[in-house]
Every structure is written in C-alpha cells, then in structure tokens.
Amino acid sequence: NSAILDYQVITNERMPNIMIYLSSFKLSDRKVNNPNIYPYNVFRGKYIEPFVFTPITVFYGSNGSGKSTLLNIIANCLQLKGKEYATSNSYGIVDYCGSFSNECSYGLGEDDFGKEIRNIPSNSRYIKSEDILYEIKKIQQKQVLSDGMEYDCVKNGMSLSEAKKYLDSKEGKRQEEYIKFAQEKYSNGETSLQYYEEYLQPDALYLLDEPEVSLSPANQVLLADEINKLARLLQCQFIIATHSPFMLGTLNAKIYNLDTNEYDT
C-alpha cells in the first residue's frame, strides 16, 4: 500500500482547461444498530472525511473494499445515467439504500467565471464493467447478422417490409459490411476499447467501475492515456474504481486507498 500513497496529486496549474463538475462528496455518517445492513455495513468503522476530487480521481482497493458501492452511491445521488438501484434486504421493507444516499452530501465545482455549477452535464454517465461485457455479448450472440439488422430497423420504427427493402439496398449492404468489420474488431480484442472511445465525449463527468475488465494491459494503458487527454484538454472529469497497476501507473490522478480505515491518499 505504501506505493499507492506515493502517488502525487496533479494540481490545476499543470492541467490547463480542466473542469471540476463534482468537487467533493461526503458519505453518510449515520450509525445504525444492525451491523449487517447494506450499504451502512460497507463503510462501518471507517473514518470518513469528504472525498475531494481532482480532474481524475481513483478509488483503489481490493475486492470488498467498497469502491464499486461508493461509485454507485455517487451515481444515485447525482442521478447519472447507468446508476443501479440496490435493495438492502430480501423483503425491501425499509429502503436503507435510498436513506443512505439521501444522507450523503456533495459539492459542485465552479464555472470559468467562478460561479458554482448548478447541474452536472446531462451527458455524464456511470459506466460499469458489466455494461461493456453486455455490449460484447450482444455482438457475439447475433446468430444471423441480417436478422439482427432487420430487428434493429423494426425497433427504430420501420415496418417489416421497409426493413427488408432497406437491407437489400446499397446502403443496407454497406451497413452490413460495417457491422461485420466491427465484429472482426472484437475478435482482435478491441471492442471494449472502441466502446469507451465512443462513449467518452467532451464536457462530462464519468464514473468508471473497473474499466480494465476485458482489456489487455496494452489497451489499459491506451485507455488511461485517453482519459488523461480528455481530462486535460476536453473538460472531462473522471472518478474511477480500479486496482489495475497499468492504469494506476498511467493515470494522472489523485488516488484514494479504500483498503485503509482512513481512506488515505
């Protein structure tokens, strides 16, 4: 853990054109009687001060440290696309997850004129590793490409006859070749990286949960480089849960170690 503590915080002076949308976040400090109630039990016994965010902030920790839970709580508080709603018990009688989220607090950043931002950008989102795996699985499980394209056309408002006519057209054939090319890219192990490249757009806050999943070490470094560029030049902010040494060694980030009781940086 000592190596993690040696990472330096990148200051605003070294990162021109940066944007901080979420400046701080404080977890609920309410004590509940039952030590097993989720998500209170995840952070029980921790000395919790507000997390203070930089353009790139990393939650580092082993499995069970609470890094994914923390990201999801932030996503719920901010109502980000991709947030997951969890229940605390098998009966759902008491909404402990909702209560916990309501007891959290956060601060927003400032705009170029020094005024507090009123809203998180609407294109911000919470991207989980299972989201990526689901997209890959969709590509793998299309049994017949033309059937999949026909289904997509009908789903987008075409009649069945219009869909068939479109797929027989020159444009439809071109689209089919494009999708085949995309599937071939997956066979080379690049679809995961391509997914991130398509979804990570300028001027947004992104919460990434274990983005290293399904990426080779080389592609993890490429993704980390892209994140650095988006944060430095294109006014993106990232909060990332990871334990990948390749990403930790490449990201220009402030790192919180969630394996300690005091959440060291």
For the regions a protein language model found, what residue spans apply to each?
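Catalytic phosphate/metal-binding cores of nucleic-acid and nucleotide-processing enzymes, i.e., regions
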Residues: T57-Y60, Y85, G92-D95, K170-R174, ...
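ABC ATPase nucleotide-binding domain signature region
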Residues: T69-Y151
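ABC ATPase nucleotide-binding domain
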Residues: P50-V52
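Conserved ABC ATPase signature
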Residues: Y126-S129, V144-L160, K165-L222
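N-terminal amphipathic/basic-hydrophobic helices that include classical n-h-c signal peptides
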Residues: N1-N17
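Switch/communication elements of ASCE P-loop NTPase nucleotide-binding domains
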Residues: Y7, N41, I56-L78, L193-T265
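N-terminal pre-Walker A segment at the start of P-loop NTPase domains
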Residues: P16-I48
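Short, flexible loop/turn elements at secondary-structure junctions
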Residues: D29, P55-T57, D131
